[in-house]
């Protein structure tokens, strides 16, 4: 069985077909179907990095990709798509882990205003939600994500980005007592919160408050939160709340 799998993978790797060249000659729907069929019968975790390569090529080589929802890839090959509230940014997340208890994901951002369908790799975990506020006239994108260390440990994160010269750059909008940050993280440990009671990062519906779970020295949730209140220049730490 291993020999057959290796032979199949060899054929498909040579056939990284060339997806970029291939996709130029057919519709985006046909190219998506070709990728879906290429990997449908294979072990996902044995080929997911090749899937990532083909998906990235397909998106980059198709001007229509921004408006396309990729139904087959999201349903069958675990592609996750998010969009910014202003619909000017589209985010793709691909599962590139090995299938064990640890999780690994690759995320990319695509700009609607870009003259090409280029993708920007992002250092995020599995993207959960995207919110948007303004700092003056500048849109600030708040991306919540989760890093899965293993089945029992992980990291919740909120990151702030802004557009600069056709690229997303970190935006240091979180003002602590001592410094400004572009991201805030909080650890998760199932030994202390097996049922994941409550949100580790709470964002108010009006986006005026962001609360971060306060952990004790043993990474145990205290039931309290560190509050960041929105101001004219970002989010200012204001103290501890319940």
PLM regions: where:
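Start-of-domain marker
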Residues: 23-89
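Surface-exposed loop/turn elements that mediate protein-protein interactions on large endomembrane-trafficking
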Residues: 60-70, 106-121, 162-172
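Bacterial Sec-dependent N-terminal signal peptides
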Residues: 1-30
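Short N-terminal edge-element motif at the start of the domain
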Residues: 90-133
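Short aromatic loop motif centered on NTY/YTY
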Residues: 128-136, 145-149, 154-157, 169-231, ...
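Short, solvent-exposed coil/turn segments at beta-strand boundaries
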Residues: 83-90, 111-114, 132-140, 203-209, ...
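Residue-level detector of short, conserved catalytic/binding motifs and their immediate flanks
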Residues: 88-90, 159, 226
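Exposed beta-strand-loop-beta-strand "reactive/processing" segments of non-cytosolic proteins
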Residues: 75-97, 139-147
């Amino acid at each position: 069985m291993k020999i057959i799998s290796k032979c199949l993978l060899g054929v498909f790797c040579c056939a990284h077909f060339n997806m970029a060249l291939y996709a130029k000659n057919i519709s985006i729907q046909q190219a998506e179907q070709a990728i879906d069929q290429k990997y449908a019968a294979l072990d996902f975790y044995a080929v997911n990095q090749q899937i990532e390569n083909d998906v990235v090529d397909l998106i980059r080589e198709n001007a229509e990709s921004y408006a396309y929802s990729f139904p087959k890839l999201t349903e069958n090959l675990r592609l996750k798509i998010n969009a910014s509230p202003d619909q000017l940014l589209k985010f793709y997340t691909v599962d590139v882990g090995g299938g064990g208890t640890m999780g690994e994901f690759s995320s990319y951002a695509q700009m609607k205003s870009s003259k090409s369908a280029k993708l920007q790799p992002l250092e995020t975990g599995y993207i959960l939600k995207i919110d948007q506020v303004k700092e003056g006239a500048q849109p600030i994108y708040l991306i919540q994500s989760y890093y899965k260390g293993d089945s029992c440990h992980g990291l919740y994160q909120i990151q702030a980005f802004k557009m600069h010269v056709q690229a997303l750059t970190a935006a240091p909008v979180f003002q602590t007592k001592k410094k400004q940050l572009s991201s805030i993280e909080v650890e998760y440990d199932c030994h202390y919160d097996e049922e994941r009671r409550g949100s580790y990062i709470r964002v108010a519906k009006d986006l005026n408050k962001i609360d971060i779970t306060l952990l004790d020295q043993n990474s145990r949730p205290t039931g309290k939160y560190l509050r960041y209140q929105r101001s004219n220049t970002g989010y200012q730490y204001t103290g501890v709340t319940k």
